[in-house]
C-alpha cells in the first residue's frame, strides 16, 4: 500500500517547498499518495488541492477579518479531510495560524497522528 502524505501549504513560498518535497518523496517512493492544500506548483506535481490555496494565503488583519468565517470553514474542511483519509503523516508548511489550528484539532481526535512542521515563516 502506498504511503499517504497530507501536505498543507498556505502561501506561495510554501507551495514551492511543497512541490519540491513532493518530487523528493516520489524519488524515494514512486507510488506515494499526496493530498492536501497547495497552489499551482504543487498542483503541477499532481496535487488535487482540497480547496484553492489562495483562500488561506492572506496577510494582515485587513485581509483576514472579513474572511474569518470562510477561514474557519476551511480549517474544518482540512480537519475533516485528515480524519477521513488518515494520512501516514501530515506536513505543515508556513501559515502557522491556519496550520496549527488544523494540527491541534486533528491531534485531539487522532492522538497518534504524525504531524511535521516543515518550515516556519521567516521575518523579512
Where are these regions (language model features)?
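Active-site and donor-binding regions of nucleotide-sugar-utilizing enzymes
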Residues: 3-124
Amino acid at each position: 500500500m502506498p504511503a499517504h502524505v497530507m501536505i498543507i501549504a498556505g502561501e506561495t513560498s510554501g507551495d514551492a517547498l511543497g512541490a519540491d518535497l513532493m518530487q523528493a518523496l516520489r524519488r524515494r517512493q514512486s507510488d506515494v499518495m499526496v493530498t492536501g492544500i497547495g497552489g499551482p506548483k504543487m498542483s503541477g506535481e499532481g496535487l488535487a488541492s482540497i480547496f484553492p490555496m489562495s483562500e488561506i494565503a492572506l496577510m494582515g488583519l485587513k485581509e483576514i477579518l472579513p474572511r474569518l468565517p470562510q477561514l474557519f470553514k476551511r480549517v474544518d474542511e482540512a480537519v475533516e479531510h485528515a480524519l477521513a483519509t488518515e494520512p501516514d503523516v501530515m506536513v505543515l508548511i508556513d501559515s502557522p495560524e491556519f496550520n496549527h489550528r488544523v494540527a491541534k484539532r486533528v491531534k485531539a481526535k487522532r492522538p497518534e497522528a504524525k504531524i511535521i512542521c516543515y518550515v516556519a515563516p521567516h521575518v523579512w
